Amino acid sequence: MTEAATQLPISLNILVDSIREAANSTLDETLRSKLGQFMSSSAVSELMANLFESYVGEHEILDAGAGVGSLTAAFVQNATLNGAKSISSTCYEISEVMVYNLIQVLDLCKIRAMEFEVNWQQKIIESDFIQASVEQLLIENYSPKYNKAILNPPYLKIAAKGRERALLQKVGIEASNLYSAFVALAIKQLKSGGELVAITPRSFCNGPYFNDFRKQMLDECSLNKIHVFNSRKSAFKADNVLQENIIYHLTKGETQRKVVTVYSSTCANDINPTIFEVPFDEIVKSNNPDLFIHIVTNEQERELANKAGGLPCSLSDLGIQVSTGKVVDFRTRENLSMEYISNSVPLIFPQHLQRCSIVWPITKAKKPNALIVNEATNNLMVPNGIYVLTRRLTAKEEKRRIVASIYYPDIANVDTVGFDNKINYFHANGKPLDISLAKGLWVFLNSTLIDKYFRQMNGHTQVNATDLRALRYPTREQLEDIANQVDFGEFEQTKIDEIINQSLQLM
């Protein structure tokens, strides 16, 4: 280590952060949103770099979607202090504005490495990371080159028939979002024993769109550490990012460790995060074939997860299914009616689900109230009867993620009814539910127990049918007993929770 290195007056991360802030101010907001590009602050970058477990020796580090290079700089700062002999950096970035600043940051990294007598090499690749990676992976006898990867990938959906989807399929990757595609490609380019740290939306932890991604991640890597923020806006406060983000650390080719370390903090600058160790089989339940990743941050959350996750039944055990409504309004516009008229049936939209009950019809509403009955719509309807409904997207004013309502058949004198595809409906093999079972489900789904449990499972406001299938439920007898205790007309949270706690002996 040179004498200058021992007297560095300012951290590399602080220098880089000033470059990041200057670059951020020059970015066009519309373009940034289009690219799904949100840069890591020095606090987030340090947090991520601190999760790596090995800095000694030689490092080949990949930073895909590098921005100004904040993540690489944070790694360099740690590695030079902790025994690194050489660092070879590969940064992918396609924005000219970012590349201009990235060059400056890598020059600072080079100076830092030289001062600590660490051999330094760098490469900036101004190409699309997905295309370049696929081309690499398809080379005969390809051998992974990186032993470190640090990522803050773009957050954008991938079109079902888009160019990216076709490229990814060539190397066996199914991805619905750029962020999962970037992480999946980085994993494939890591050597066995290589470490990956990424910050992404939490949405990959559950839901059908990320099944393939979770399977690849957990098949090929050990999930070792997770860092969660207690506020949606904590990680990217300056960028108005409302997604709930998490940071995670993986080791490729390592047998899954028995314990996952979960860190939680109020924000990236929090110097005293809560640290909680959780058995892996409580993070990823063995009885969940979709490999949902269930994050608990303290003993209270763990107890709640064990209570809710330890309930005896699946939906199939109860003879119940949950499906998404069949009516996609824009595909059958000609068969929609604002008013309930002759030869039509009720069409239930999220607007009709209010305070855990159904309000129908709604005059002067934005959405229709009825569906015309004809050959084109016959397969979009279900038999009129009792169903439990939930919104797929939670309204901003709702305090709970799952808001359940009971649909009763006496709403109209009809044989069938239509449910919009932004609604989930519980049914018995396509037919209505028994009243006692429906009431029991209604109480259970609207309980604080399930709301808290669902928030642990789910990092966004969507409530998909797959998520509802993944829940555990009381027995049929317990649900019927719960229904018998409902002696109130309008929704009352306190009474709902009292019934659930007493009936399921959760106190």
UniProtKB/Swiss-Prot annotation:
It is an enzyme of class 2 (transferase). Keywords: DNA-binding, Methyltransferase, Restriction system, S-adenosyl-L-methionine, Transferase. One of its GO terms (biological process) is DNA restriction-modification system. One of its GO terms (molecular function) is site-specific DNA-methyltransferase (adenine-specific) activity. It comes from the Bacteria. The keyword DNA-binding applies. It catalyses: a 2'-deoxyadenosine in DNA + S-adenosyl-L-methionine = an N(6)-methyl-2'-deoxyadenosine in DNA + S-adenosyl-L-homocysteine + H(+). The keyword S-adenosyl-L-methionine applies. This is Type II methyltransferase M.PstI. A gamma subtype methylase that recognizes the double-stranded sequence 5'-CTGCAG-3', methylates A-5 on both strands, and protects the DNA from cleavage by the PstI endonuclease. Belongs to the N(4)/N(6)-methyltransferase family. InterPro entries: MethylTrfase_TaqI-like_dom, N4_N6_ade-DNA_methylase, SAM-dependent_MTases_sf.
